[in-house]
A protein has these predicted regions:
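Signature of N6-adenine DNA methyltransferases within the class I
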Residues: 18-42, 47, 54, 136-137, ...
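Conserved, well-structured core segments
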Residues: 114, 351, 418-421, 506, ...
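Preference for the N-terminal adenyl/adenosyl cofactor-binding alpha/beta module
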Residues: 1-189, 193-195, 218, 222-231, ...
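Secondary-structure capping and boundary motifs in well-ordered enzyme cores
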Residues: 1-2, 37, 41, 107-111, ...
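S-adenosyl-L-methionine-dependent nucleic acid methyltransferase catalytic domains
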Residues: 12, 163, 169-171, 193-310, ...
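Flexible, glycine/threonine-enriched loop-and-boundary segments that flank and lead into catalytic domains
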Residues: 124, 158-175, 262, 275-311, ...
Length: 624
């Protein structure tokens, strides 16, 4: 069905955009050569698709009915082989004709990514970690990675034949590689931008015509989903046709689109299990001379065998560690397994692409840039990720600091992202930090995306000095909510049974502290349990806690079913404490902390520092 959809999209686009010489060739074929009830539409489409795989003059074409024989030879593998075509009713036949009556000529190939994402079920999209990338976000990656430099080179080459020739030759020797290409959005945008730069230079030096040198065969990708893989290949073909039309409009030279050239550089597979160099080789010419050239490209007598420039980019799947399958965790572990850092199991899935990208460009002039979650630039993920990168003598060339992910797709990703560019370490090269509409030139960028050297703050469970009291995880009830009281419930219980107040304490976590929400909890010591059970409301709640824990899947929770009056994890001390929320807004310059009295239990949604003197609070809230 995936191949069928790709073939349909191509035919609709081809009949409206001039790929097929006859306008409405495909739609008219459906209207005139098939029964109105749709009974023979399947067979007729199979015949038409087969014809588009037959070269001109082949014996098989002679036996084709006239209605189907008008279809040209397409090639490229799009119509190669028999693939399932669904059966049609009169209603579905009409829907197909209605689709053909739309004008597909000016369709933006970028929207196929949006369309693909809308077709994927939300649960599958979550499993794959797929997020469609809009053109503005794509340009945040491509411009600092290579486009800005190519634009500067194009400006220097305009009107100067020798420079222009060298520039065009350079363009033909670049490889562009997206190892998580999805439906091809990054590759399509990159292809269009590079072709337009080429046109600008050729316009200024007509002697270098007749034909362009940049080809879709310079664009490489890996995609794990078969439908997205088909759409990526199709979109590149359509994008090439659009740019050929633009080439004709600007330079008056017509470049034939058909027959399509095979494009086997978009590989179907798992990028974390494939050898990237087998997909995008580092050696040999990036492409042979284009099929349409009448003479060797730019008068060259032999193909260029220089080592190509390679740029790797993309928006890999995010998937936090808790969302990953066992197989996905193993894939990340295989990449970072030799790291001296702990907590490899907590790495986001996107870290796999960062690691393999660093491995690919190590010791070479190649560069890479990826959209990633901002998690890899903060907290415990920094150690294992950046240990691997820095050991390969790689540095950050540019970075976009945290921004909310937005696009035009139906399903928004709902994450905060960064963009990170990597290159071989240079002594005198400058780096750039982008923040909203501002850009700052710096000597070096730290793994926290601030100006500075590659220093990593290591995870530790112990204070840096014995003078600091320990910070501990808050107390976790695992009670099904039965040991916790809202402010209203607290007053109801206390008003009914005054003696219950001796078993109740204030209960505060991140939300309670930041928002000022008032909650309470039952906090009962073992020696108090017999007295506490005399109170009906407490006895009722303890029975519910016991039942909840017995039914738990966690052995550690079930072990406390016979002690329902206790929190399963207890850190509380009857002293004043500092509360440090585990989660707060990223827009805050400081983590909101505060002092709590000895009668407040800090929950597991926050951290606690007990017996802390005022100077400890001062250091914790300092930006030093």
């Amino acid at each position: 069905m995936n191949v069928f959809m790709a073939r349909l999209l191509f035919c609709f686009f081809a009949e409206d955009s001039g790929i097929f010489e006859e306008e409405r060739l495909f739609t008219d074929f459906i209207e005139r050569a098939t029964a109105s009830d749709g009974s023979d539409l399947r067979e007729q489409l199979e015949r038409a698709f087969a014809v588009m795989n037959l070269p001109p003059g082949s014996p098989e074409r002679a036996a084709v009915p006239i209605s189907a024989a008008r279809f040209p030879y397409v090639n490229g593998g799009l119509f190669q082989g028999a693939h399932a075509v669904p059966r049609f009713s009169s209603r579905s036949r009409k829907a197909l004709i209605d689709a053909g009556n739309l004008d597909w000529s000016d369709i933006n190939t970028d929207i196929f990514g949006n369309m693909f994402q809308a077709c994927v079920a939300p649960d599958k999209r979550s499993c794959l970690g797929e997020h469609y990338t809009s053109v503005p976000n794509i340009m945040k990656v491509l411009r600092p990675l290579f486009l800005e430099e190519l634009e500067n080179a194009a400006r220097q080459a305009r009107g100067h034949e020798a420079r222009a020739r060298k520039f065009i030759e350079r363009l033909s020797n670049i490889r562009f590689f997206d190892p998580a290409c999805g439906s091809g959005n990054f590759l399509i945008v990159a292809f269009k931008e590079v072709r337009r730069l080429e046109m600008e230079v050729l316009e200024s030096v007509p002697a270098l015509l007749p034909m362009p040198s940049v080809s879709i065969n310079q664009f490489y990708g890996i995609e794990i989903d078969d439908f997205a893989h088909e759409i990526a290949m199709l979109s590149l073909w359509l994008a090439e046709h659009q740019m050929n039309q633009e080439f004709f409009e600007r330079l008056g030279k017509r470049v034939p689109t058909l027959p399509l050239r095979p494009n086997d550089h978009i590989v179907l597979g798992n990028a974390l299990r494939l050898d990237w160099e087998t997909v995008c080789p580092k050696t040999a010419p990036a492409q042979a001379a284009p099929l349409w050239t009448v003479e060797p490209l730019l008068q060259r007598a032999a193909p260029d065998v220089r080592e190509p420039e390679i740029y790797i980019f993309g928006n890999p799947p995010y998937l936090g560690s808790k969302m990953q399958s066992v197989a996905q965790k193993e894939e990340v572990k295989n990449i970072y397994g030799n790291s001296n850092s702990e907590n490899i199991s907590n790495l986001d899935y996107v870290c796999g692409w960062i690691g393999l990208g660093a491995e690919f460009i190590a010791g070479s002039p190649y560069q890479c840039a990826f959209v990633t979650t901002n998690s890899i630039t903060q907290g415990e993920q920094v150690g294992p990720v950046w240990d691997l990168i820095f050991k390969k003598n790689i540095e950050i060339s540019f970075a976009y600091t945290s921004f909310k992910w937005t696009n035009n797709a139906k399903y928004q990703a709902g994450v905060t992202c960064v963009i990170i560019g990597l290159r071989r370490k240079h002594v005198n090269s400058k780096s750039f930090i982008y923040n909203e509409n501002k850009v700052k030139e710096v000597d070096k960028i730290s793994p926290y995306l601030i100006p500075g050297s590659p220093v990593i703050v290591r995870r530790t469970k112990k204070p840096v000095t014995k003078k600091f009291p320990p910070m501990v995880f808050g107390s976790m009830p695992r009670d099904g909510g039965h040991l916790i009281l809202t402010e209203e419930e607290y007053h109801e219980v206390v008003n009914k049974e005054q003696e219950s107040i001796s078993f109740i304490k204030r209960f505060s976590g991140s939300q309670e502290f930041i928002r000022g929400t008032i909650r309470y909890c039952f906090w009962i010591a073992p020696e108090q349990i017999s007295q506490a059970r005399k109170i009906f409301e407490i006895r009722k709640r303890l029975d519910l806690v016991s039942k909840e824990r017995k039914e738990s899947k966690a052995p550690s929770t079930r072990a406390y079913a016979d002690r329902p009056y206790l929190f399963v994890q207890r850190a509380y001390k009857p002293t004043d404490s500092i509360i440090i929320p585990a989660v707060s807004s990223e827009r805050r310059e400081y983590i909101p902390m505060g002092y709590l009295d000895k009668d407040t239990v800090i929950s597991n949604s926050a951290f606690a520092v007990y017996d802390a003197e005022p100077w400890v609070f001062g250091i914790l809230t300092s930006r030093m």
